Amino acid sequence: MKAKLLIMFIALFALAGNNGVNAQTKKKKNQPVPAEAVDLGLPSGTKWAPYNVGASKPEEFGDFYAWGETKTKNPLRYTKEDYRYYKNRREYVNIGDDISRTEYDVAHVKWEGNWCMPTKDDVKELLDNCKFMWTKVNGVIGGMFTSIINGNYIFLPAAGGPWYEEHRYVGEIGKYWLSAQDPDDNFNAYSLVFGSNRTFWGGGYDRGAGQCVRPVFKK
């Protein structure tokens, strides 16, 4: 009798443990999608998310992703060799010149609908129509982009990013993936980059590195 009770107890304990793991997994998979995007009055009608993929507030870093990957990983695994599309030391697998709204677009995969990674044109439009200010929000350093059209703004934290054994440039630089691969170098993709006195976008950023993603909303 005691043996049967012990077996039942172990079974119930295991079931409860599995439910706890499943609940945590489910919770982690649920991405907090914004109720609405921020309208900066941009000519194209494109709107920007108020926070990053994996975050729930503008000042939160959210999750870090290698370019074209849609899952997070151990910070020590943001390397060339651990990149999902690593082919060999001379090249990465080509997954497309622009991955916006594809299976490789983490914003589109996680948030679905009309959300996607920003393109080069989206970021150019943002910089052409917004004033940039290096500032703090709730103690977090980052960049404020304020529309010169309607005064609305978005804040992007200077989250830096993981690369090999370091998480670099926290509070110093913001790096955000764009949807375009660098046409001049298979290893690299485009990013929006900003610091205390400079904001620009361009290629030259290794696709295997971890960066934040700030989605845009397009109808």
Per-segment meaning from a language model:
Residues 1-27:
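Bacterial Sec-dependent N-terminal signal peptides
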Residues 25-219:
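Conserved positions within compact, well-structured domain cores
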